[in-house]
Amino acid sequence: MDFQPGELCAYYRLCRYLGIFCIDYNPTKKKFRLRRSVLCYIVHFALQAYLVGCISVMVTYWRRCFKSELTTTGNHFDRLVMVIALGILVVQNAWLIWLQAPHLRIVRQIEFYRRNHLANVRLLLPKRLLWLIIATNVVYMANFIKTCIFEWLTDASRLFVITSLGFPLRYLVTSFTMGTYFCMVHIVRLVLDWNQSQINAIIDESADLKMTSPNRLRLRVCLEMHDRLMLLCNDEISLVYGFIAWLSWMFASLDVTGVIYLTMVIQTKKSIVLKLITNVVWLSPTFMTCAASFMSNRVTIQANKTAKMLTKVPRTGTGLDRMIEKFLLKNLRQKPILTAYGFFALDKSTLFKLFTAIFTYMVILVQFKEMENSTKSINKF
C-alpha cells in the first residue's frame, strides 16, 4: 500500500523518541513500518527502569517527606497517588510496546482512509492539539518543579527529589499517547461523515429506476466501509488504546480527588483566582482524558446517524431495500463503538462515572480525616 505522510506523523515521531512505540514513516517505501531502532528500545527500557526505581524508593521510604500541613490520611493518599501514577505508566509503556503490530495496522488504515477520502480536507486539529500538548507539558512541569521541588521537598534528599520527577513524566507520555488516539478518532469521524454524504447522494438518486443497479453497488461499498470503520474502532483501536483509556480514567479519579482534598486541607494565603489557576494546571491531564472521551462520543453519534438515515429511505421494491434492511438488522442494537477495553463505553456517560468515583473517594477521605481527628482528641485526654 502506497502511503503518504499525514498530520499524525509528528505524533508517531515524538512517541518513538519517547520510547513509547517504534512506528515511523519510511519515505523510500512510502509506507509506515516498525522501525525497531536500538535507541528507541534503550529509551524505553531506561524509562521503565527509572520508573520501577522510583516506585521502589517511594515504597521503601513511604513515610519520608510527609507534609506537616496535611493529616496522616492526606499524606498517605498523596503518596499512594504518586506510586499509582508511576505504576500506571510502567504498565502503559509495556502495553504499547507489546502491541506494536496491531498498532501499526491501525496507523496504516487511518492513513489509508485519510489519503483516499480526505485528501482535499485540511486537518487543523492535529497540529493545534500538538502545540497545546507541548505548551501544557511545559506549564505542568514548571508548576511541579515550583510547587513540589522548591516548596514541599526543600528538605528532602536528592535521591527523593529525583524520584519525584517520575510523576510529571506520566503526563508527558500519556498526553502524546492520548493525543495520538484523539487525532485518530477525529479522522475516523471525518471519514464516517464523508461516507454518509455518499450514502445521501445515493438515496437522492434511488428514485430513478435506471440508476438502481449502479446505486446498489455504490451503496454496498459505502455500507461495507461503515462496517470496516466500526470493526477498526471496536476491535483494533479499543484493543490498543482502550486499556490505556481505562488506566487514564482510573488515575484521573484519584488525581482529581487528591487536588480537591489538598485544596480543602492546606490553607494558604493565595487568592482564589491563583488557587483556581493552579488547580487547572494540576488537572490538565484529566482534561485531556475527558476531551478524548468527548471525541469518542462524537464518533458514536456520527455512526448512529447512518442507521437513522437509512431508516427514512423510501422502499423502491428493488435490491436496495434488502441491502438496507440487512444493514439495519445488524445495527439495530448498536454496541458501544469505542470502549475502555470493555470496562465501559468512552462517551459522555464516562464523566458521570468519573464524578461518582471522585465523590466516593472524597467521602472516604473525609471519614478517615474525621476518625483521625477524633483519635487525636481522645488521646489528649
Swiss-Prot record:
**Bilayer topology term:** Multi-pass membrane protein
Gene Ontology terms: cellular component? axon; dendrite; membrane; neuronal cell body; plasma membrane
Q: What are the recorded Gene Ontology BP terms?
A: chemosensory behavior; male courtship behavior; monoatomic ion transmembrane transport; sensory perception of taste; signal transduction
Q: Which residues cross the membrane?
A: 38-58, 80-100, 130-150, 172-192, 240-260, 272-292, 351-371
Spell out the InterPro entries in the cross-references: 7TM_chemorcpt (IPR013604)
Q: Which GO terms describe its molecular function?
A: ligand-gated monoatomic ion channel activity; taste receptor activity
Pfam family, any one = 7tm_7
User: What keywords are assigned to this protein?
Assistant: Cell membrane, Glycoprotein, Membrane, Receptor, Transducer, Transmembrane, Transmembrane helix
List locations, semicolon-separated: Cell membrane
Topological domain ranges for the Extracellular compartment: 59-79, 151-171, 261-271, 372-381
Q: Cytoplasmic topology: which positions?
A: 1-37, 101-129, 193-239, 293-350
Write down the glycosylated positions: 373
Q: What happens when the gene is disrupted?
A: Leads to reduced courtship levels toward females.
* UniProt note on tissues of expression: Expressed in the adult labellar chemosensory neurons. In larvae, is expressed in neurons of the terminal external chemosensory organ, as well as in the dorsal pharyngeal sense organ.
Which residues lie in coiled coils? none
| Protein family according to the UniProt entry | Belongs to the insect chemoreceptor superfamily. Gustatory receptor (GR) family. Gr21a subfamily.
Record's function text? Gustatory receptor which mediates acceptance or avoidance behavior, depending on its substrates. Plays a role in sustaining courtship behavior in males, possibly through the reception of a stimulating arrestant pheromone.
- Quote the protein name from its UniProt record: Gustatory and pheromone receptor 39a, isoform C
